[in-house]
């Protein structure tokens, strides 16, 4: 029996210890700092790359051997920080700490603030900063003055209690709730969202195949496809790129168009929780007709120049003696023909006909592909809502919660009060109330 009682007391002690720990502000701050540190690590170290990438970039022979090498990165999960069990556990414990703090501290404090407290003895006012004796004749006049300053008034005999700014005491609870909501939305996106990248030629259909990241509970929809109807680039007068556009249609399983939109950078297409972004582009081929015969599609390969400009090169004739190369630098309709020695022999316009090496060659058109990023994050609406509530509740939390007490004894009136912020403004308010009541 004694042993059972000891076990019960031990369990009770453990519960109280955990309650005090989780509701402790310092504990929450430590958790927040740990989350910030690991988030910084996740920002510095590239996430969700192939193992070969880390073996190349973070070799065992570098100067940070004891800390930052590919083995440690993969061992501790720094290559996918935000989906590791320990990071998600930190978020859960931090949320639990905020919830416990709200339940055990904030809500009781709010309930206590809503109770009416009346003082009967003027000596009780000595603990208040700015307490004073007021020269007036009626208690009702003081109550009226408090109402002019938006105080909620309660009277009991010869005592008055007033308060205002109760929302300022309520706001911290909503701040904690907003942070918990924010973390919930973030975790939901991590475990059930996904990201895909596709490079699609103009006129082609595509489905979600190249998934670059996904959560454990992600669902990759395959009940519809998409088609790139057209791709074009808008250039500045100096031939630099101003913007590139993709005309995209969403199709159901029967090929019926469900939605069509032209996307560009910062203007994505949204459909059933999916967001399709314009991210990149490429030139993959040029179509030519030789001697009015068959149409050939010449593949192009991109080459990065030392000045970071990109060109596309394709082989027009394979024979060594008559080998020619076609070079494009953009999609503005011009190209250049080079011989096997790398000499520029002809500048052409796409869509026109030329005689080259005794052959009539018509350069019909170029085929470009658009780089698309497709994302699904079901936590985004929750995150946006939580930010709205967080900003609103933080703003409201700056409202001062002020309490004022007035007592009459032997025809003398005493006033005093407390506030949780803006102490000087509160003392000035007390003086104004005193002057107003004395002048009536």
From Swiss-Prot:
InterPro entries: Cyt_c_bgen_Ccs1/CcsB/ResB, ResB-like_domain
Source superkingdom: Eukaryota
Predominant location category: plastid
Any GO BP: cytochrome complex assembly
Cellular localization per UniProt: Plastid, Chloroplast thylakoid membrane
Record key words, sorted: Chloroplast, Cytochrome c-type biogenesis, Membrane, Plastid, Thylakoid, Transmembrane, Transmembrane helix
Spans traversing the lipid bilayer: 25-45, 84-104, 170-190
Annotated Gene Ontology cellular component terms: chloroplast thylakoid membrane
Tagged with keyword Disulfide bond: no
Keyword Glycoprotein (UniProt): no
Membrane topology of the entry: Multi-pass membrane protein
Family: Belongs to the Ccs1/CcsB family.
Known function: Required during biogenesis of c-type cytochromes (cytochrome c6 and cytochrome f) at the step of heme attachment.
Complex formation: May interact with CcsA.
Listed name of the protein: Cytochrome c biogenesis protein Ccs1
Lineage: Eukaryota, Rhodophyta, Bangiophyceae, Bangiales, Bangiaceae
Gene coding for it: ccs1
């Amino acid at each position: 029996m004694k042993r059972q009682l000891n076990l019960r007391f031990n369990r009770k002690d453990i519960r109280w210890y955990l309650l005090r720990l989780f509701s402790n502000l310092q504990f929450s701050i430590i958790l927040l700092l740990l989350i910030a540190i690991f988030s910084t690590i996740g920002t510095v170290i590239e996430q969700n790359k192939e193992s070969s990438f880390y073996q190349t970039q973070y070799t065992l022979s570098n100067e940070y051997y004891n800390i930052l090498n590919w083995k440690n990165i993969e061992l501790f999960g720094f290559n996918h920080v935000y989906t590791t069990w320990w990071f998600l556990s930190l978020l859960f414990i931090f949320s639990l700490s905020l919830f416990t703090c709200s339940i055990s501290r904030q809500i009781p404090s709010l309930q206590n603030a809503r109770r009416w407290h009346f003082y009967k003895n003027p000596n009780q006012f000595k603990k208040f900063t700015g307490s004073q004796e007021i020269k007036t004749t009626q208690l009702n006049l003081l109550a009226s003055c408090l109402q002019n300053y938006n105080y909620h008034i309660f009277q009991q005999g010869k005592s008055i209690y007033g308060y205002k700014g109760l929302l300022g005491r309520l706001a911290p609870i909503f701040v904690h709730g907003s942070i918990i909501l924010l973390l919930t939305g973030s975790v939901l996106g991590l475990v059930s969202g996904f990201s895909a990248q596709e490079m699609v030629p103009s006129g082609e259909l595509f489905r979600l195949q190249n998934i670059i990241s996904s959560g454990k509970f992600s669902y990759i929809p395959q009940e519809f496809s998409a088609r790139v109807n057209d791709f074009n680039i808008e250039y500045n007068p100096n031939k630099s790129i101003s913007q590139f556009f993709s005309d995209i249609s969403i199709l159901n399983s029967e090929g019926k168009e469900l939605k069509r939109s032209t996307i560009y950078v910062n203007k994505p297409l949204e459909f059933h929780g999916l967001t399709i972004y314009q991210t990149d582009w490429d030139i993959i081929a040029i179509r030519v007709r030789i001697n009015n015969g068959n149409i050939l599609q010449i593949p192009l390969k991109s080459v990065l120049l030392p000045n970071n400009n990109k060109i596309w090169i394709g082989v027009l004739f394979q024979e060594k003696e008559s080998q020619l190369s076609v070079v494009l630098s953009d999609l503005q309709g011009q190209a250049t023909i080079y011989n096997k020695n790398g000499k520029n022999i002809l500048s052409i316009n796409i869509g026109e006909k030329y005689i080259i090496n005794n052959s009539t060659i018509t350069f019909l058109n170029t085929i470009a592909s658009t780089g698309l990023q497709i994302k699904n994050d079901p936590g985004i609406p929750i995150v946006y809502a939580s930010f709205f509530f967080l900003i609103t509740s933080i703003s409201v939390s700056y409202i001062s919660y002020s309490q004022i007490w007035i007592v009459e004894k032997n025809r003398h009136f005493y006033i005093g009060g407390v506030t949780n912020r803006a102490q000087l403004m509160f003392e000035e308010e007390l003086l104004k109330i005193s002057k107003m009541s004395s002048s009536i």
